[in-house]
Amino acid sequence: MKPLPVISCCTPLAGAFLSDGEAAELERLFRVLGDRHRLKILNILLRAGGDAVCVCEFIDHLGLAQPTVSYHLKQLTDAGLLEREKRGTFAYFRVRPAAMERLHGLVEPVAG
């Protein structure tokens, strides 16, 4: 009598998987991005095409108080997503292209 073949119920997993460090980095970034105001700020900056945007423009566009906008900008800056530039008494922000590339590089394999 011939032995029966073993049939696997699962498709073997293939490809590169997130390391613990990459997963922790994504978790940190998603926590920062998990706020609608920060997502709106990031959207404004991405639409600015690399140009710096003054903090006062966020206040006008978002309808938030200056301290609240500053808090959200600090969260995004501390996460490494934005860079800050001081011009006189005003602060200007822009997206760090390297940070967006890194985020895309981490998310793309997960998204497929």
Where do the language-model regions lie?
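Histidine-centered divalent metal-coordination motifs
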Residues: 38, 71-72
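Short, charged/polar, Gly/Pro-enriched secondary-structure boundary elements
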Residues: 99-103
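Short, hydrophobic-biased segments on the C-terminal half of alpha helices
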Residues: 42, 73-74
